[in-house]
């Protein structure tokens, strides 16, 4: 099953579908020379934590909650969940792939989706 085609994101298979096709549950790490600035310019790489980080700021709690709801629904589809916290209008996010002990394409895909959901939540 392709995910989030209607939102224009890259397609991905769920972990269950990958297992059914004989693939490992452990996604491959992205290369060390990955161009974060070009791919996800609003995110900050944290090499020490093998993660990427971003703080989102919204007009109010309602927008922040809408953003988190959109992200949570997509995270469930992708079976890839952020480490995040919320304080009124701010949402702080760290993305990493724990099973791979570092950054994978799942993190980049989730970051791009979150950037889009932030814009959608502010409408």
Predicted feature residues:
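Charge-rich alpha-helical segments
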Residues: 2-123
């Amino acid at each position: 099953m392709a995910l989030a085609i209607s939102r224009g994101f890259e397609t991905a298979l769920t972990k269950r579908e990958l297992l059914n096709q004989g693939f490992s549950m452990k996604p491959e790490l992205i290369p060390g020379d990955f161009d974060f600035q070009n791919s996800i310019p609003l995110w900050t790489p944290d090499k020490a934590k093998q993660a990427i980080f971003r703080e989102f700021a919204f007009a109010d709690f309602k927008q922040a909650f809408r953003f988190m709801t959109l992200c949570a629904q997509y995270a469930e589809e992708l079976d890839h969940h952020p480490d995040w916290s919320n304080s009124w209008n701010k949402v702080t996010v760290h993305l990493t792939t724990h099973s791979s002990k570092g950054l994978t394409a799942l993190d980049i895909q989730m970051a791009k989706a979150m950037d889009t959901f932030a814009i959608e939540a502010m409408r």
